[in-house]
Regions:
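PLP-dependent class I/II
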Residues: 2-6, 10, 20, 26-34, ...
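Extracytoplasmic catalytic/substrate-binding loops of multi-pass membrane glycan-assembly enzymes
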Residues: 13-15
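Phosphate/diphosphate ligand-binding glycine-rich loop within oxidoreductases
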Residues: 36, 55-68
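Conserved N-terminal alpha-helix of the aminotransferase class I/II PLP-enzyme fold
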Residues: 65-98
């Protein structure tokens, strides 16, 4: 049987990077002692008040169709929070609910881009951005971000990548996988380029609430940007609700209308009981997020302190989020070999970061998704594996 060219455009190295994670999940299901640090699904349970509201709504019969773009009370709550953090007034008409941020990015790409367009994206970039852009028929143009700069954007390189075919700039701040938070000066420069070249900006801000040392700034807060920015966010990371699939897109009301028509054909609305639970998540947001941020900060510090002592590894201290980039190029293996050999030898799954772009070659991504004791054990296993490589290397060289 024949399939459309779309399925080919969705294939690629970036989406195949999950193979080691799937192998780790299968090993864990068989009862093997594995530590899975290869994906951003934390070990926290969703806060009880949120769960109880979902159960209450289910028992109350909230199991019918809902408004395609989302119920007004939840959209209004999201709009109020966005207004508070950006200083730019938006309302429920500027918000559409999505089945997680991933769904929002995909929908935005389809509504903004078409064949012949180019989308400029700093690299390393999140794994699925390329497939989302290619699904629209557009071409993703990566802008390499040098590890020597701590993976901070070179705005001159971004400007050089813009052509008459450029339609949009996509980026994440804080960034997955690097944990970099874009400073205001870089965002001001991107905003200036977007206004100058009449470009859309899609800003993935899923980790905005989980910043450590550097304050998060939304590009939608800058002058002249609200009307050309699509802000994507979710409750997945900030509230330990990855499996609930609650995300949203914020943008001009006209765009929300287009997204709604796409959602009519694609999603047909989030379940009502989930939306009711999400409202409770917003009511308790301040405390939940503060607690979550502190846990991730402690976990980050545990991993950084332990792995920074391991000869052959170089850790980059993340400014936000739940991941750390670790340079393993000093170990004598490429990242595919390193991750798979580590997994088979020590039962720890990390993600080969080269899947996020060539600029991440030599790095692996480690997630702070288990408790501190388990993270410490994972670090010990990684250290033992690296030490074993260094013991074997002289023997191999002598042979």
């Amino acid at each position: 049987m024949k399939y459309s060219s779309l399925v080919e455009r969705l294939q690629g190295k970036r989406t195949s990077a999950w193979e080691i994670h799937h192998a780790a999940q299968q090993a864990r299901a068989r009862g093997e002692d594995v530590i899975v640090l290869s994906v951003g699904d934390p070990d926290f349970a969703t806060p009880e008040a949120i769960v109880e509201r979902a159960v209450e709504a289910l028992r109350g019969g909230d199991t019918h169709y809902t408004a395609v773009v989302g119920r007004e009370p939840l959209r209004a709550a999201i709009a109020r929070e966005h207004t508070r953090t950006t200083g730019r007034a938006v309302g429920a008409d500027n918000v559409m609910l999505c089945a997680g941020a991933q769904n929002g990015i995909f929908a935005a790409a389809l509504c903004l881009c078409e064949p012949g367009d180019e989308v400029v994206v700093p690299e390393p970039l999140y794994l699925t951005y390329e497939a989302c852009v290619r699904a629209s028929g557009a071409t993703l143009v990566p802008v390499p971000v040098d590890a020597a700069r701590g993976f901070h954007l070179d705005c001159d390189a971004l400007e050089a990548a813009i052509t008459p075919r450029t339609k949009a700039i996509f980026f994440a701040t804080p960034c997955n996988p690097t944990g970099v938070v874009m400073p205001r000066a870089d965002l001001e420069r991107i905003a200036q380029l977007a206004r100058q070249h009449d470009l859309w900006v899609v800003s993935d801000e899923v980790y905005a609430d989980l910043t450590f040392e550097r304050e998060h700034v939304s590009i939608a807060s800058l002058e002249g940007m609200a009307e050309r920015t699509v802000t994507i966010a979710s409750l997945s990371k900030s509230h330990a609700m990855a499996g609930w699939r609650v995300g949203w897109a914020i943008g001009p009301a006209e765009l929300i209308g287009h997204l709604g028509r796409l959602a009519l054909c694609m999603l047909y609305g989030l379940p009502g009981f989930i939306q009711e639970a999400a409202l409770v998540a917003f009511e308790h947001k301040a405390q939940i997020v503060a607690d979550m941020r502190e846990v991730y900060r402690r976990r980050r510090d545990v991993v950084y302190e332990r792995l920074s002592r391991v000869k052959g590894l170089r850790c980059l201290l993340p400014e936000a989020g739940m991941f750390m980039m670790v340079d393993v190029s000093g170990c004598g293996l490429d990242t595919v070999e390193f991750t798979w050999q580590l997994f088979r030898a020590q039962g720890v799954s990390l993600l080969d970061a080269s899947a996020f772009g060539e600029t991440a070659n030599g790095f692996v991504r480690l997630g702070f998704v288990v408790d501190e004791a388990r993270l410490a054990e994972a670090c010990d296993r990684i250290a033992a594996f690296v030490a074993g490589l260094q013991v074997r290397a002289p023997v191999l060289n002598a042979g």
